[in-house]
Amino acid sequence: MTPTTFAALLSKIRTGRPLIHHITNAVTINDCANVTLCIGAAPVMAEAPEEVREMVAMADALVLNIGTLSRQQVGAMLCAGREANACDVPVILDPVGAGATQMRTDSARMLLDALHIAVLKGNAGEVGVLAGADAQVRGVDFLGIGSDPVAVARAFAEDAGITVVISGATDIVTDGKRVLLVDNGHEMMGRLSGTGCMAASLAGAFAAVADDHVVSSAAALAAFGIAGEKAAAVASGPYSFRAALFDGLAALRPDDIVQGARVRVL
């Protein structure tokens, strides 16, 4: 679990161009597609229930994001997720806004129960709510959690048998046994809508080329954070930062990860 390992995964993405099937939200769908392209993978954004089984069968990872939820979309997620499980395609779930409304919380829990999720990625509030901790969410924003987020993530991951990612100033990645802390990133990333969704897309791209999803998730977050740091150095505000972030991901080299990844083992 060294930066060299993370860099090798980036090289595998660029060489293999894995197909990442998204069922995601209307607010950030274009950003998710573009961030997937910039890292070197291929996005497809299909969510019609009539076609998702066929599409996911040819994919290398499936990213589910409940940001703009509907009953039809949840049905499509179930169809796609079951096919992904049958085809051994890793599933990444981003439970956007879980804890804000009962529908979001129930839908996220149902997907966790019905599917084998490889990676659950959310903020501390979303993950805390799903783990049964005392957490507060307003809209899609995290307000607070009454417990240590590392302990919450670790216990939840071990109990559910999944990799849990909590995004924040320091990202937490754990499977219940191992805990990695990723310190890369910049505060400007929190001032731009959709960076959490983009992180889930990158988690899908890296999961597509790795069996160890603790390593792949940490690699995705380190790569995203390094690109964010580089973007902040040249941006004058949130929207120029957005453009620089995409440019930074597209220009990211394996050596940038080797030299720039700041990851700690807890």
Show which residues each predicted segment covers.
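Acidic-glycine-rich active-site phosphate/pyrophosphate-binding loop
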Residues: T2-I13, I162-N184, D256-V258
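N-terminal glycine-rich anion-binding loops that anchor highly charged ligand groups
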Residues: H21-N34, A46-M58
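Glycine/small-residue-rich loop that forms an oxyanion/phosphate-binding "nest" at active or ligand-binding sites
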Residues: N65, Q73-G122
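Conserved phosphate/ATP/ADP-binding segment of small-molecule kinases
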Residues: R104-V179
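Short pre-catalytic strand/loop immediately N-terminal to key active-site residues, enriched for Gly-Thr
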Residues: V150, R154, L180-S193
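Short glycine/threonine-rich catalytic loop with a Thr-x-Gly-x-Asp
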Residues: H186-A203, H213, P238
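Conserved post-catalytic alpha-helical subdomain immediately downstream of the catalytic base
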Residues: A203-R242
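Charged C-terminal helix
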Residues: I226-L266
